[in-house]
Amino acid sequence: MMAIRELKVCLLGDTGVGKSSIVCRFVQDHFDHNISPTIGASFMTKTVPCGNELHKFLIWDTAGQERFHSLAPMYYRGSAAAVIVYDITKQDSFHTLKKWVKELKEHGPENIVMAIAGNKCDLSDIREVPLKDAKEYAESIGALVVETSAKNAINIEELFQGISRQIPPLDPHENGNSGGIKLGNQSLQAGRRCC
């Protein structure tokens, strides 16, 4: 039987870049042309094999509107990974991405895996952000970079597979600490009671 690891992943980025569409495509293999903006955050899960483990992604899709920005730390706190999404047809969304990365580096978990997703690559004829720029920036911060299209299901699975590969495997010899909770029978000492 394969071990299941729960990995909290948050998606960050401007409103309208396609965060919810990426999550829907990954989890449900569905694209909604009329998707509404996320209010606060939404949550979905999907389990995928990775080596001799199963990774259960606990995906928090955060709202991109400025008024919800202050809620973001609540979602990326304790995350194993963050996907920062920008729209390849909107240069401003790439600049905002850098603010998210700065915030993650200052306030996020120390060893968080970062992935940059340049979404809407199906619209490359109206591209404003060259892939070269995204690759150079990703390399400078030690992040994965993938161009995706939630609409056409391009590189969505590859994005999450890349994150899975960056997560260090559990060390079963590490003092028995697997990052989980140990459950077992505990006998009460004579004369000691709970309350």
Swiss-Prot record:
Activity regulation field: Regulated by guanine nucleotide exchange factors (GEFs) including RIN3 and GAPVD1 which promote the exchange of bound GDP for free GTP. Regulated by GTPase activating proteins (GAPs) which increase the GTP hydrolysis activity. Inhibited by GDP dissociation inhibitors (GDIs) which prevent Rab-GDP dissociation.
Residue numbers covered by motif Switch 1: 30-42
Location relative to the cell: Early endosome; Golgi apparatus, trans-Golgi network; Golgi apparatus, trans-Golgi network membrane; Cytoplasmic vesicle, Phagosome
Motif position, Switch 2: 63-79
GO biological-process terms attached to the record: cellular response to insulin stimulus; endocytosis; Golgi to plasma membrane protein transport; Golgi vesicle transport; intracellular protein transport; phagosome maturation; positive regulation of phagocytosis, engulfment; receptor internalization
GO cellular component: cytoplasm; early endosome; early phagosome membrane; endomembrane system; late endosome; phagocytic cup; phagocytic vesicle; trans-Golgi network
GO MF entry, a single one: GTP binding
Keywords, sorted A to Z: Cytoplasmic vesicle, Endosome, Golgi apparatus, GTP-binding, Hydrolase, Lipoprotein, Magnesium, Membrane, Metal-binding, Nucleotide-binding, Phosphoprotein, Prenylation
Membrane topology: Lipid-anchor
PROSITE patterns associated with the record: RAB
Annotated lipid attachment (S-geranylgeranyl cysteine): C194, C195
Tissue and organ distribution: Detected in brain astrocytes, spleen and intestine (at protein level).
Cofactor section: Mg(2+)
Annotated GTP binding sites: G16, G18, K19, S20, S21, D32, H33, T38, G64, N119, D122, A150, K151
Top-tier EC class: hydrolase
Pfam families recorded: Ras (PF00071)
Predominant location category: other
Modified residues (Phosphoserine): S36
Positions that bind Mg(2+): S20, T38
Catalytic activity: GTP + H2O = GDP + phosphate + H(+)
Function: The small GTPases Rab are key regulators of intracellular membrane trafficking, from the formation of transport vesicles to their fusion with membranes. Rabs cycle between an inactive GDP-bound form and an active GTP-bound form that is able to recruit to membranes different set of downstream effectors directly responsible for vesicle formation, movement, tethering and fusion. Required for the integrity and for normal function of the Golgi apparatus and the trans-Golgi network. Plays a role in insulin-stimulated translocation of GLUT4 to the cell membrane.
Family classification: Belongs to the small GTPase superfamily. Rab family.
Assembly behavior: Interacts (in GDP-bound form) with RIN3 and GAPVD1, which function as guanine exchange factors (GEF). Interacts (in GTP-bound form) with EEA1. Interacts with NGFR. Interacts with EGFR. Interacts with OCRL. Interacts (in GTP-bound form) with APPL2; interaction contributes to or enhances recruitment of APPL2 to the phagosomes; interaction enhances Fc-gamma receptor-mediated phagocytosis through PI3K/Akt signaling in macrophages.
UniProt protein name: Ras-related protein Rab-31
Source species taxonomy: Eukaryota, Metazoa, Chordata, Craniata, Vertebrata
Name of the gene encoding the protein in the UniProt record: Rab31
